[in-house]
């Protein structure tokens, strides 16, 4: 989807519809490569929060505490995550300090936050604003928490990293091992039931639907989980097992079981999955979110 493209094609005007609070057009935005991009996204989030607080007084206190009282996107995210993941024995103040320190020390984490927000806003027609994703998208929140846990894992603070993993699984129903490496511009759409194993690697601009498993094949140790290339789309309920490689721009059909490598720009569909050819001119499915062209366009030949 390109910037400025309508989220929905709705040529027939709907009668008796209340006026929309959110525009149905994704605003033009720069690529998330600089502090200016982070500032722009943060300004959009604050504007949306002010608008929503005015429109819905019941949410005003929540929006002020979570967004409007904070000086930056990373502070707002840290506060929100800390309050989502805290428990009676894992205090929100401890988690807030942990998230703030991690985001401050690792600019790549902040860049990934912005890229993930842009990904959700541009790829998901149900995403009505950046603030909606920041506050309500559990897939987005689970990824940000996992990135902090990944930093802790690399620092050999593994007990705390695993405690974060456990809380994310309990709160969001998303189970991502702290050692898994996740790129930027990643969308976990719906996210419920997503499981990503210890040695999994996920590239940039990947989209993953709910109930997806990137798992091992049994009790083997070592490098045993899938490697997902850039721009891959993994449909709902798909399972990919073992140290297999899913090439850049590949597509995994909903409900498929993948046990073999999938070449770049190729679709895998079925249980067990078979490979269908791709076309060099196709959009990257992880960005276009085209779930069905493997049936409509590529079913005329197979590899």
UniProtKB/Swiss-Prot annotation:
It catalyses: L-serine + acetyl-CoA = O-acetyl-L-serine + CoA. It comes from the Eukaryota. Residues 1-36, 271-290 are annotated as: Disordered. The keyword Ion transport does not apply. Keywords: Acyltransferase, Amino-acid biosynthesis, Transferase. One of its GO terms (biological process) is cysteine biosynthetic process from serine. One of its GO terms (cellular component) is cytosol. One of its GO terms (molecular function) is serine O-acetyltransferase activity. Pathway: Amino-acid biosynthesis; L-cysteine biosynthesis; L-cysteine from L-serine: step 1/2. The keyword Nucleotide-binding does not apply. It is an enzyme of class 2 (transferase). Its EC number is 2.3.1.30. PANTHER family: SERINE ACETYLTRANSFERASE. Homomultimer. Belongs to the transferase hexapeptide repeat family. This is Probable serine acetyltransferase 1. It comes from Oryza sativa subsp. japonica.
